[in-house]
């Protein structure tokens, strides 16, 4: 899943020489929390709502409302923005981008064209969450089983073959080695199109095939934790 399919393509920017007041208005009008800062069509910084709050708190301690409004028109964005902004190319995968955000402790980044270098979008935590919801299939409801299985060829197929025999249609299959011993993996299978009687029989069979961690039936918000 590439960034270019999930980013916001409408990019609202400000100039380094613009005032803090201008940035506040742009964020409110466009319902954004991050503005790329440009100078001569080149990205020179990032301004976030956090930067604005920090600047307002430090510079407006003892000012009345009129002095504060005047101050907001005088403070330049170049003085409060974060310089040397982190960016990602539009052909980055969503999971790579999530790693960049975590590593740098930021909530979003400008997205660039890898050939031209110009800004083509913005990707934020919210966009990554949307991608995660789509990837897992949780928006489709259904049933999710979580297993701990042997890490060997065919171990996932054995489970999915049984699920298909009971009429289940796979919505998503995810796998992880996080927190597992050598030779073991966790697998999360989301399915739909299975009736409740078949589900009960399927559950018993799967328990005999692998270590089950939990089952969530979103149709009735029924949750079973096995381990």
Regions found by a protein language model. Give the residues of each.
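Tandem CBS (Bateman) regulatory domains
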Residues: 1-10, 49-86, 93, 98-102, ...
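Basic, Lys/Arg-rich alpha-helical nucleic-acid-recognition elements, primarily the DNA-binding modules
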Residues: 1-52, 56-61
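A glycine-centered beta-loop-beta connector
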Residues: 27, 35-51, 101, 109-126
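Short acidic/polar active-site loop segments enriched in Thr and Asp
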Residues: 33, 107, 169
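Short, ordered loop/turn segments at secondary-structure junctions
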Residues: 40, 114, 175-178, 218
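Conserved short beta-strand edge segments in small beta-sheet-based binding/regulatory domains
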Residues: 171-174, 203-223
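Short proline/glycine- and acidic-rich turn/helix-capping motifs at secondary-structure junctions
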Residues: 177-185, 216-227
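Short basic, glycine-rich beta-strand/loop surfaces that mediate nucleic-acid
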Residues: 184-195
